[in-house]
């Protein structure tokens, strides 16, 4: 227990919520790690600590024996995904291959092969600007760099807008806050973290969307 520092600079955050795992990997304490992600808990610490991670599709890696007592995730399970963390993309891929698959204790887990159909001319959409939001120059440059790598490998790159990003966030918040905190066992977090999560949950109380409407909207957006 104790404060987790960013191994590159103690004045900077290691990110979260899987910041401890990311810091351990970046500092050489561990070659590989496992975390979970609802809204960035794998991806945020990965970019803060300079390692590799991803949020797989829900069910790709079975969610068992990770957070004690949190196997029954309720509606939070719609977003909750287990994922690997590593110092390189190659290590990340190998870890994902090892962990993926069906597990009897996770009804959302699935067995799907990784060598599925790949389009002859794969496409990727990139977003470099968001309405009413500022994106740091370094982030835009990283997106452009990734797009160039894909383009050099034969991908078709298309720059698109994301006009409903705030609406998507509100839907995510409404679904997530519909009882998620009740599913977390008592004494899982320290008091300051508990207070932060309570404030986070209160954000959705002013949203006029009902849970049913939010779920319907989520399905509509997934079809677009």
For each of these PLM feature ranges, what is it?
Residues 121-127, 174-223:
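Short helix-loop capping/hinge segments that flank enzyme active sites or metal/cofactor-binding pockets
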Residues 38-39, 163-165:
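Conserved beta-strand edge residues that scaffold enzyme active sites
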Residues 92, 150, 214:
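Residue-level signal for inorganic ion chemistry
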Residues 156-161:
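General small-molecule cofactor/ligand-binding pocket signal
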């Amino acid at each position: 227990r104790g404060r987790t520092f960013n191994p590159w600079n103690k004045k900077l955050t290691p990110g979260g919520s899987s910041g401890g795992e990311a810091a351990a990997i970046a500092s050489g304490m561990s070659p590989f790690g496992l975390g979970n992600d609802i809204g960035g808990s794998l991806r945020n610490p990965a970019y803060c600590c300079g390692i590799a991670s991803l949020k797989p599709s829900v069910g790709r890696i079975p969610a068992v024996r990770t957070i004690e007592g949190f196997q029954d995730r309720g509606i939070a399970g719609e977003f909750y995904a287990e994922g690997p963390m590593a110092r390189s993309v190659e290590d990340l891929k190998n870890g994902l291959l090892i962990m993926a698959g069906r597990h009897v204790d996770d009804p959302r887990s699935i067995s799907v092969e990784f060598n599925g159909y790949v389009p002859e001319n794969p496409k990727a959409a990139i977003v470099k600007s968001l309405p009413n939001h500022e994106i740091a120059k370094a982030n835009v440059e990283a997106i452009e760099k990734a797009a160039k790598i894909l383009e050099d490998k034969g991908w078709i790159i298309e720059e698109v807008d994301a006009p409903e990003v705030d609406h998507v966030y509100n839907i995510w918040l409404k679904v997530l806050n519909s009882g998620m905190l009740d599913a977390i066992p008592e004494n899982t977090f320290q008091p300051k973290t508990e207070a932060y999560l309570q404030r986070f949950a209160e954000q959705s109380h002013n949203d006029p969307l009902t849970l049913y409407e939010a779920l319907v909207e989520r399905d509509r957006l997934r079809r677009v």
